[in-house]
UniProtKB/Swiss-Prot annotation:
Keywords from the UniProt entry: Ribonucleoprotein, Ribosomal protein, RNA-binding, rRNA-binding
An example Gene Ontology biological process: translation
Transmembrane segments: none
Function description: Binds to 23S rRNA. Forms part of two intersubunit bridges in the 70S ribosome.
Organism: Maricaulis maris (strain MCS10)
A Pfam cross-reference name: Ribosomal_L14
GO molecular function, one term: large ribosomal subunit rRNA binding
The UniProt record lists the keyword rRNA-binding: yes
Protein name: Large ribosomal subunit protein uL14
Complex and partners: Part of the 50S ribosomal subunit. Forms a cluster with proteins L3 and L19. In the 70S ribosome, L14 and L19 interact and together make contacts with the 16S rRNA in bridges B5 and B8.
Amino acid sequence: MIQMQTNLDVADNSGARRVQCIKVLGGAKRRYAHVGDIIVVSVKEAIPRGRVKKGDVRKAVVVRVAKDIQRKDGSVIRFDGNAAVIINNNNEPLGTRIFGPVPRELRAKNHMKIVSLAPEVL
């Protein structure tokens, strides 16, 4: 579960390395974001000559959470850390590569571009 002030790794090559959630989109009092949800992030750490700079405020899709993800068949999936992919205003990823596995729950949330770029879908 991602909430305000949560630090996340960036799972793409947009130039950001670490981001901090500053807002969970989808309702005035919405507190938590899960896999596939869109959040507003502030870039806390970035590489030189990247597409995004430190201090930029961008939208991002949560692709991995450390909290258990319950599936309909009763199975549970869990990741080692929290990660997000930075997106533009058209909900397309800013980077051209995705690093690490992503869950198939992203497919149900219509983030097909992220699923197709990912090296592994769990």
